[in-house]
A protein has these predicted regions:
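Glycine-rich anion/phosphate-binding loop at the beta-strand->alpha-helix junction
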Residues: 5, 73-190
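Glycine-rich, mobile lid/loop segments that gate access to catalytic sites or pores
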Residues: 1-96
């Protein structure tokens, strides 16, 4: 920890100097959904000051109640984390083997509890038409932006300048006190 702290602070300072902001909130936990990002920059700033990273504090209280209930029963809960990166320059990534989604997914799936990763609309895009999913480009105060951000800030494996939106499904911790079935390897029997 002591060795990684200076590196984390240096990275944070470097990102801030490039006007890149990163923030994560608990989108879903213990059956309760938090609000989605709306005023991204303001919400990113406020999330960094919170002990329990949610946008809607009332939803956070409900999550905590459900977490405590599961813990009292010797169980655990999973959830979904939503991360947003703003200020990422256009052109980060590669279209083929080092796509931005591929590189980020590789890192995220290296966390053992992460069981699913999606960008932008993710799995919801399976129910959309191409005309709905496509992020149309437009000029806004002289800048090229997209009207929607269904692709989560990435087109063809490369950042497009819109906020990068990533969701991770995190499984409930398997280290629980609730009795469960297992196998006795020595005697070769179920226990």
């Amino acid at each position: 920890f002591l060795l990684s702290l200076p590196l984390a602070l240096a990275k944070s300072s470097m990102l801030a100097s490039k006007n890149i902001k990163i923030g994560t909130h608990i989108l879903k936990c213990a059956g309760v959904f938090d609000d989605s990002f709306k005023n991204i920059d303001d919400e990113l700033d406020s999330l960094n000051d919170k002990a329990f990273a949610v946008i809607n504090d009332d939803k956070g209280k409900q999550m905590i109640e459900n977490i405590e209930k599961a813990a009292a029963e010797g169980d655990s809960v999973g959830g979904i984390l939503e991360t947003v990166v703003t200020g990422l320059p256009v052109g980060v990534g590669e279209p083929w083997f080092d796509s931005l989604e591929g590189v980020l997914s590789h890192g995220l799936f290296s966390i053992p509890a992460v069981k699913g990763v999606e960008f932008g609309q993710g799995f919801n895009c399976a129910d959309m038409l191409g005309s709905e999913m496509n992020d149309s480009f437009k000029l806004d105060n002289g800048e090229i932006v997209t009207e929607t951000n269904n692709n989560g800030g990435i087109n063809g494996g490369i950042s497009n300048g819109m906020p990068l939106v990533i969701k991770c499904a995190v499984k409930p911790t398997p280290s629980i006190s609730k009795e469960q079935n297992t196998v006795d390897f020595i005697n070769k029997e179920n226990t």
